[in-house]
Amino acid sequence: MKRLYPYLFFLFLCLSAQAQEFKVYQFPADKVPAIDGNTHDWDCVPADYKITEAALKEDEGKHAQPDTTTLKVSVKVGWCAETQKLYFLYEAYDNYWRFSENSLNTDIFEVVVDGDCSGGPFIDRFHPTAPKDVWQAWFKFHGCHAQNYHIFTPAHGNDWCMLWGPQVWLKQKPYADYAYQYSFKEGEAGKLVLEFYITDRKSTRLNSSHSV
């Protein structure tokens, strides 16, 4: 089956600022993962598709390499052409989970997706013509070239992520779904499993009644 290698920028803590190209597994429509937090649907994905903490980079220059005694991660990504969705399995061990505060200062898994590799800025303040009306830049520009998901690990109450941009429906069904598995409490060590899918914004243009 043909393999897809779109550009996905994974910013777990801080991945290298330089773009990296990762393998994405091709799921047939009848084999897409059930979003239930169970990892068995991912057993078919080859080991060399897995992204680990070895790909992480601490960007403040305090550590030469990740400390696996404090954080270990494993990420697998899949794509289904029929559903036009990206599927993620994120597994992480942390020696201290922080998630009770409703802010981005808690543990998150951050994903930025540029579905057609069009490139260019996607944040309102970097609008190429710098419109005087900041709200026009927000609604008409922010999140167009790429979509930025700040995914809480685990969820903040009923909210599983902060989608940075006005297209908030992209984090809701049928465009996204998620499931967690964990047993730790705030401040404890433990393993978290996060399974979710998201829909590339560009593939929603012909399928959505929302204004994009």
Which ranges hold each PLM region?
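Bacterial Sec-dependent N-terminal signal peptides
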Residues: 1-23
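Structural preference for beta-rich elements and adjacent junctions enriched in aromatics
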Residues: 20-212
